[in-house]
Amino acid sequence: MLGLFKKTPKLEARFEPRVAVGRELAKEVQLAGELVLRNAGRDVELTDLELVLVAGGTRRIDLALPEAWKRSVRMAAGSELRERVDWTVKLAAPMRASSAEIQVNTTAGGKHRPLAMTSPFPLGNE
């Protein structure tokens, strides 16, 4: 019964981009930089994480999860996970967006639950 009242962890996400560009004609997005996930609440164990790029407010693009985050991750209160990331994602259709955000979700328990979202960062267009 206690599992029914499990609280969503208090997490904060931050992306510090070195490269953030959408190539409209090549139908791809390239992101590189450092992704930081900070635990602003109690000790927590994170499982079944996924990352989604939200561009232009509506376009959602799945991103590969860093290797260290693919297994169960235990975070103490106030701790941070830092990963250098470098994604180049091919798109099915051209995309033009001036900014984007990265959303951290969990699919634990069979449902998609958002855990944290980065602040919007500029997305260049080529």
Spell out what each predicted region is.
Residues M1-A26:
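Low-complexity, acidic Ser/Thr/Pro/Gly-rich terminal tails and inter-domain linkers that flank the onset
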Residues L11-E12, T58-S72, P114:
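Short beta-strand and strand-turn-strand segments in soluble, beta-rich domains
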Residues A20-L37, R84-V85:
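Contiguous beta-strand segments within globular domains
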Residues L25, R38-D48:
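A short beta-turn/strand-edge loop motif at beta-sheet boundaries
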Residues L63-A92:
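A beta-strand/beta-hairpin structural motif
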Residues L91-I102:
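Short glycine/proline/serine/threonine-rich loop/turn segments at secondary-structure transition edges
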Residues Q103-H112:
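Enriched for extracellular/lumenal, surface-exposed ectodomains of secreted and cell-surface proteins
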Residues K111-E126:
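Short beta-strand elements
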